[in-house]
Amino acid sequence: MCEKSQTIKELLNAIRTLVVKNNKAKVSMIEKELLAFVSELDKKFKQQLNNFNELQQKIPLLQKANEEFALKFERMQREAQNQIQAKLDELNLKNKKELEQAKKYAIAKTLDQPLNIIDQFEIALSYAQKDPQVKNYTTGFTMVLDAFSRWLEANGVTKIKIEPGMEFDEKIMSALELVDSNLAKNKVVRVSKSGYKLYDKVIRFASVFVSKGNKKS
């Protein structure tokens, strides 16, 4: 009985020893796993810390880039506004000039009748030199003609001065006919109807006879 009890005790001790050994092995395995996990966490933490440090180093560069972009955008915006304003000023100036030009030359449409009246008086005065009966009215005709001329000049209308012998100029003259003359070719022989300008614009071309330049004395 005593031997059996001893054997059982030994067996129990062996089993207990085996369990303890197995537990230690299990604890050691768990400890290793924990250490590996902690080591991995430490690596990841250090990596994140490095990333954070790199980001902190980049922040001033990013801030500088942001400031430079803001300044560039502000400069571009200012230049765009200046260009737009310049274009508006140009359009306003153009419209103003066009309006002034329109006002300046608006009277041109109303000048036909006054110019025709002047033509009639000039014709009458030219005949007055030849007809004694009409010559008595010369003073009155001249006064009316002068009054019309002053009114026209006050409104920017001037007669184009053309004399026989002048070179024909298509910019201010209209040729009625080419005629035989002692004058050189392309010279004005006679003015049939006076031409007029409104400021610097021709509103009526002078009607003239032009020399062929082939008449022999």
From Swiss-Prot:
Q: Where in the cell is it found?
A: Cytoplasm
Give me the Gene Ontology terms describing cellular component.
Answer: cytoplasm
Which GO BP terms sit in this record?
protein folding
HAMAP family the record matches: GrpE
> What do we know about how this protein assembles, alone or with others?
Homodimer.
The record's function comment reads: Participates actively in the response to hyperosmotic and heat shock by preventing the aggregation of stress-denatured proteins, in association with DnaK and GrpE. It is the nucleotide exchange factor for DnaK and may function as a thermosensor. Unfolded proteins bind initially to DnaJ; upon interaction with the DnaJ-bound protein, DnaK hydrolyzes its bound ATP, resulting in the formation of a stable complex. GrpE releases ADP from DnaK; ATP binding to DnaK triggers the release of the substrate protein, thus completing the reaction cycle.
Q: What is this protein called?
A: Protein GrpE
Origin organism of this chain? Mycoplasma genitalium (strain ATCC 33530 / DSM 19775 / NCTC 10195 / G37)
The UniProt gene name for this protein comes to: grpE
